[in-house]
């Protein structure tokens, strides 16, 4: 019966999200409410630099690629890896996929390592217990620099400064940007095409871009027309 808690009797004192910035995106959030004791001990408890850690990126091009390769020994995924997924934002994956909360490979799970740092331009379920860095904006399909991150890159996460930075030089940034080619989008339905045209990034709520033009509709433009109204004298026979 004691499900809804008040402020004085909370489940967790410091919970919620952190809003992050970085040198390869303008905005992201981290679900700090689900940081486990295991995760905190492994990544956030360095006495010299608490809440700061550096991991090597392992990059996946969407959920299909993740499921296909996560258990490959060639990736050499270990507890110092950060799993990165892209192509999952509102443009790359209309609706934005709930896929950022990736599990470690089976061999790490068997060792008791139940969570690795993860990062991506998609979403995750509200019930997920993964402390992912998600909603990376702009997404890779919109030209965001998440698209130039490579497997093996070192990524520095500093929760004290609310920053996530890839540790490459400015010249390397420019080189990768100049060589990058964004893959053409594959619209499987007209609704996907429409969504990609009018929906913004997750940092803005993935809302319709022209939404601000349609406030106080009745005052500005009158009551919208009813699509089934013929007048009081008419009745429908079904």
What kind of region is each of these model predictions?
Residues 1-139, 144-238:
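Catalytic or ion-coupling anion/metal-binding cores of large enzyme and transporter domains
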């Amino acid at each position: 019966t004691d499900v809804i808690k008040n402020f004085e009797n909370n489940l967790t004192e410091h919970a919620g999200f952190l809003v992050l910035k970085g040198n390869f995106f303008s905005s992201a959030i981290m679900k700090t409410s689900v940081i486990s004791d295991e995760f905190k001990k492994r990544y956030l408890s360095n006495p010299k630099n608490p809440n700061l850690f550096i991991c090597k990126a392992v990059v996946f091009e969407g959920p299909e690629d993740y499921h296909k390769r996560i258990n490959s020994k060639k990736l050499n995924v270990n507890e110092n890896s950060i799993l990165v997924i892209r192509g999952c934002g509102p443009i790359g994956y209309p609706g934005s996929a709930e896929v950022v909360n990736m599990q470690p490979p089976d061999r790490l799970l068997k060792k008791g390592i139940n969570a690795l740092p993860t990062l991506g331009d998609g979403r995750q379920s509200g019930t997920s217990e993964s402390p992912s860095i998600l909603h990376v904006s702009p997404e890779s399909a919109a030209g965001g620099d998440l698209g130039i991150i490579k497997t093996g890159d070192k990524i520095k996460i500093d929760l004290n400064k609310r920053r996530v930075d890839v540790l490459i030089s400015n010249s390397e940034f420019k080189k990768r940007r100049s060589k990058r080619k964004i893959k053409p989008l594959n619209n499987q339905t007209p609704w996907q095409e429409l969504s990609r045209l009018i929906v913004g990034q997750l940092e803005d709520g993935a809302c319709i871009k022209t939404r601000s033009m349609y406030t106080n509709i009745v005052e500005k433009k009158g009551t919208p027309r009813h699509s089934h109204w013929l007048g009081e004298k008419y009745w429908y026979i079904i």
